[in-house]
Amino acid sequence: MEEPQPPRPPASMALLGSQHSGAPSAAGPPGGTSSAATAAVLSFSTVATAALGNLSDASGGGTAAAPGGGGLGGSGAAREAGAAVRRPLGPEAAPLLSHGAAVAAQALVLLLIFLLSSLGNCAVMGVIVKHRQLRTVTNAFILSLSLSDLLTALLCLPAAFLDLFTPPGGSAPAAAAGPWRGFCAASRFFSSCFGIVSTLSVALISLDRYCAIVRPPREKIGRRRALQLLAGAWLTALGFSLPWELLGAPRELAAAQSFHGCLYRTSPDPAQLGAAFSVGLVVACYLLPFLLMCFCHYHICKTVRLSDVRVRPVNTYARVLRFFSEVRTATTVLIMIVFVICCWGPYCFLVLLAAARQAQTMQAPSLLSVVAVWLTWANGAINPVIYAIRNPNISMLLGRNREEGYRTRNVDAFLPSQGPGLQARSRSRLRNRYANRLGACNRMSSSNPASGVAGDVAMWARKNPVVLFCREGPPEPVTAVTKQPKSEAGDTSL
């Protein structure tokens, strides 16, 4: 029969030893402890204490040792991870934050330009195409201007968005030299072609206003001549914008010839086309149109300042309004010319400067080049804003169909034709809105023989301000229509 073994002391008692000499020991019989047993107990106690200390350090660091690899090896990694989490952001993170804020601001500016240019020019083109009465000579030039600005927004600005999120300094790989070279040529072609068309279209609008106000009525630009001028403008833009450097021998792409450099290059390749081509491009497509704009509006302002009668005989009230509507259109075009020169002037200056210095195209574009290109894009977004400010009836023209409003020649005939949709309160508000601005005109109409219809004529002139989109002249009395020759039609700008 086996003797029952005495109960084993707790682990703490075994590690610390017995306080009495006769106490049982885990290493030997009662009555004393040997040196070997004492050494084993001390070594085990040391290892256990170290392990418990490591576990406590790992738990204080905020992470367990098991996911880091387990045991003693994972505790060091856990302490390092905890320290990394608690480490504050250093000064090296400031450039990253500032770069992100700059990219976000540039993206917002590009988005604003894109929305104004695309939506605004689409609205302008829709107004002209929707209403048959607005398909006139001046509106043909405006349609060309809006089309070029719209194509610039659709084909050039998406590449600028892509450039914002492209790592800086990236160059084209050797395997993609051919496609990359074609992309650079296409980018320059779109930007140059549509910019030239936009500038030439504004010059043609100025020429049309000059012929309408300064020259005799028989010298106005006709439809056939307008189509010829527009065709010449587009062909000139195509001729100067074609990538002629592709016809030469292909050259090695420079390391700095990046996506950013292709997009914001402000001049043709001087190594293949020469500086003379850049100078000729600026002079023929920008400086000469600028001079034509200034010449036309100088004579327009001079004619208006000297005498109204020298432009055409003013013997009816309707002709007075017609003349002032033409002057108002010329004023709007003058505002457009100021913005065109301000937006395209820096670009032309940089092109001439690069041609004079024989700057190489492999140099990265400077900040001035980027700002100059962005200003040319912004010009396409400014023009629709000018239309909307100078003509408060843009929304009315967009919402009105062809048969409404333009079939009649009289405001009083237009108002009842709207039926129950336009109540009496709306009609009175519409009349008061434009009648309050007619102080001088109404005083002049009191001496007019046709004062009975002068109010309707004045209301038509204020309700349909001749800003840009051209249409037929203001309504005249039936008796006056039979006396007036048909060749003296009114201004045809909206």
From Swiss-Prot:
**According to its UniProt record, where is this protein located?**
Cell membrane; Endosome membrane
Start-end of Basic and acidic residues biased regions: 485-494
Q: What does this protein do?
A: Orphan receptor. Has spontaneous activity for beta-arrestin recruitment. Shows a reciprocal regulatory interaction with the melatonin receptor MTNR1B most likely through receptor heteromerization.
Q: Region Disordered: which residues?
A: 1-35, 473-494
Broad class of the protein's primary localization: membrane
**Entry's Gene Ontology molecular function annotations:** arrestin family protein binding; G protein-coupled receptor activity
Q: Output the Gene Ontology cellular-component terms.
A: endosome; endosome membrane; plasma membrane
Q: Where along the chain is composition biased (Pro residues)?
A: 1-10
Under what name is this protein listed? G-protein coupled receptor 135
User: Which terms are listed as keywords in the entry?
Assistant: Cell membrane, Endosome, G-protein coupled receptor, Membrane, Receptor, Transducer, Transmembrane, Transmembrane helix
Q: Which organism is it from?
A: Homo sapiens
Q: Which family does it belong to?
A: Belongs to the G-protein coupled receptor 1 family.
